[in-house]
Design a protein with these regions (language model features):
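Acidic, surface-exposed loops and disordered segments
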Residues: 1-161
Length: 161
């Protein structure tokens, strides 16, 4: 997000494109690389061009969310994900966001969830900082013990405006 504010374009590149000789270093496997630089044209694109799901498709609201909550969710929504899978789902109640991962029919997409969620959380936390919101990311035992049919609980964001 910082590079974006400086007019620098970026793109995450997954493992299949990276040459095999560069995939491992010190017994660690490289998962993703970020390419970045000054674009020929604009590095900005319209939200519709990003082909992201709407907040209504991603969120369940227990009550009408405040404007700052929608802004925070929108930052999470716009995060890039592998193959544009957008695995995150949100249950919003008061000043809490319960974050879930959509279960994948294929393990090929699911293996990227840690990277995808890391990027999404970075977007969310950067937006929260810009809005002067305090956010605690916590794992609630009562939700982590439940079995959900189409989703898996990840974390909860507790916000203090």
């Amino acid at each position: 997000l910082y590079m974006y504010t400086r007019g620098i374009g970026s793109c995450f590149i997954g493992n299949p494109i990276i040459k095999k000789k560069y995939q491992y270093r010190d017994k660690k496997r490289m998962m993703v690389v970020m390419a970045f630089g000054k674009p020929k044209g604009s590095c900005y694109r319209k939200q519709a061009e990003a082909k992201r799901l709407s907040l209504d498709d991603l969120c369940v609201y227990k009550e009408t969310p405040r404007q700052w909550m929608k802004q925070l969710l929108d930052a999470a929504r716009m995060a890039p994900s592998s193959m544009n899978s957008q695995p995150w789902r949100f249950v919003v109640f008061d000043s809490r966001i319960h974050i879930f991962s959509k279960k994948h029919p294929s393990d090929k997409l699911g293996k990227w969830d840690e990277v995808n969620f890391g990027i999404m959380f970075a977007n969310m936390m950067t937006a929260a900082e810009e809005m002067w919101l305090d956010v605690d990311l916590i794992r609630l035992d009562e939700l982590s013990q439940k079995n959900f049919q189409n989703n898996q609980y990840v974390l909860s964001a507790i916000l203090r405006p």
